[in-house]
Design a protein with these regions (language model features):
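Short beta-strands and strand-loop turn motifs
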Residues: 59-60, 117-120, 176
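Charged helix-capping and loop-helix junction motifs
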Residues: 73-76, 130-136
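Active-site entrance/lid segments in N-terminal catalytic domains of soluble metabolic enzymes
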Residues: 1-106, 110, 122-125
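Glycine-rich beta-to-alpha transition loops that act as phosphate-gripper elements at the mouths
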Residues: 35-36, 95-102, 129, 148-161
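Alpha/beta catalytic cores of nucleotide-metabolism and tRNA/nucleoside-modifying enzymes
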Residues: 133-223
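Conserved mixed alpha/beta catalytic, RNA-binding, or beta-rich assembly cores of soluble enzyme
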Residues: 120-123, 144
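Conserved, mostly hydrophobic/aromatic
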Residues: 58, 86, 108, 116, ...
Length: 223
């Protein structure tokens, strides 16, 4: 299955429009917030709760986004204590996005985070950093039995989803292709992209002898 995510940007109206979309579909959505001050994040968590979101989170690597500075929106890194405060502020599952090391993943476990997303923000926050697929397996080995691990980055075809699942992710986030689909074809464009990814994933599973997305063997990956 799939579920939509909305984001927080330098333009505050973007987050508000996203929450409206979550309301429109009866709460079937996740709100991801930039690493602002905890006070500002908690305000946005309350807005997400009122919209009926099923989960909230913070994309921690957004601390380095130039676009936030251009809009005069202060962001910064979070400590374990900061994360503990955010986790305690809501009854919704809390997601930490932008995790790229075992140490960061362990810090999230300590803070009580429910889910992490292994992600380098599409390579847009730090040049020359590793790709998500380079670090995912080690992170899963370290914390996969303690916390839900998702991943994203360069997912362009269904086989890319299968690769991440084989490396240990429990789910995969897709961004750019869906944006392209929405700009070019609105709702129908997004539906086409999703159906294409699903078809490609199914075909890749057949050709690798994979019966279930919940039990993808890492033996199908060549390193």
């Amino acid at each position: 299955g799939s579920i939509g995510m909305i984001g927080d940007t330098g333009d505050p109206t973007c987050y508000e429009f996203g929450l409206q979309a979550i309301k429109k579909v009866g709460g079937l959505g996740v709100a991801i917030i930039k690493p602002r001050s905890n006070e500002e994040i908690i305000k946005r968590i309350r807005m997400a709760e009122e919209a009926g979101a099923v989960a909230v989170g913070v994309d921690l690597d957004g601390a380095g986004l130039v676009t936030m500075k251009l809009f005069g929106q202060p962001v910064g890194p979070k400590t374990v204590e900061d994360l503990k405060e955010l986790v305690a502020s809501t009854k919704l599952p809390f997601i930490a996005k932008g995790i790229m090391s075992v140490d960061e993943a362990l810090a999230c476990v300590e803070a009580g985070v429910n889910t992490i997303v292994v992600s380098n923000h599409g390579g847009r926050v730090l040049d020359y950093c590793q790709a998500s697929c380079d670090v995912l397996e080690d992170i899963v080995k370290a914390v996969g039995d303690k916390i839900t691990v998702l991943a994203d980055g360069s997912v362009r075809e269904g086989v890319d989803v299968l690769k991440y699942l084989a490396l240990g992710a429990k789910g995969v986030l897709v961004g750019r292709p869906l944006i392209w689909g929405s700009i070019g074809g609105r709702k129908e464009g997004v539906t086409t992209i999703m159906n294409t990814l699903k078809s490609q994933l199914s075909q890749a599973m057949i050709l690798t002898g994979t019966d279930d997305v919940k039990s993808v063997s890492n033996k199908i990956i060549t390193k």
